[in-house]
Amino acid sequence: MPFAFATAADQADQALAGLDMGHDHARLVVLARAGRSWRLEQCHEWPLEPGWLQGGRIGDFLPLADTLQQSLADTGVSRLAMALPAEACASAVLEQPGGWSRLRRRAWLQRQAAALLQRPLSDLTWSAHALPGRPRRWRVLCASLDVVQDWMGLAEAAGCDLIGLDEVHQASWQA
């Protein structure tokens, strides 16, 4: 999901909320502009009810959306960036065969992402990041579009402006 997070976050001086949910808790941080950087204003953490999240997917949508909406209302922030739960993402570190053009490498990376989730490329979002060193290695990260759409719907139901949905942050921890 190609969100230009840095650009979206930098375009306004409004406060920004960041949400990270695990299988049993949620953490919401509020950042405010401090010149050219961001300053931590608030940090809230609360437990999630059993069944609200199941394997990175939203299991009980309405109570989770209501809780998120109330938490955001308490902060007064409407702009939100979220990290997908680690269980919602797949990742792998792959060694690239040598001598390939950019187009051939891109097609290979796409096939690898589709193989990770065992789904057609049209059913997922993916990204690849070159790792330093030789031989050339890539970290491929992906999530299914239906999971991404669930999380985008959660932000919409909570009444916030989603400026970033990050699978890279979570999936990179699995690699």
Residue ranges and their predicted role:
Residues 2-47, 80-85, 175:
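Gly/Thr-rich phosphate-binding beta-strand-loop-beta motif of the actin/hexokinase/Hsp70
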Residues 16, 68-70, 75-87, 155, ...:
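Short glycine-rich phosphate-binding loop at a beta-alpha junction
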Residues 25, 86-89, 145-146:
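Gly/Ser/Thr-rich loops at beta-strand to alpha-helix junctions
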Residues 35-40, 97-109, 156-162:
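A short alpha->loop->secondary-structure connector
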Residues 42-72:
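N-terminal phosphate-binding loop and adjacent alpha-helix
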Residues 61, 84-141:
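Internal amphipathic helical hairpin motif
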Residues 123-131, 160-175:
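Short, surface-exposed recognition loops or helix-turn segments adjacent to catalytic cores
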Residues 139-153:
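Ligand-binding face of N-terminal immunoglobulin V-set domains in extracellular IgSF glycoproteins
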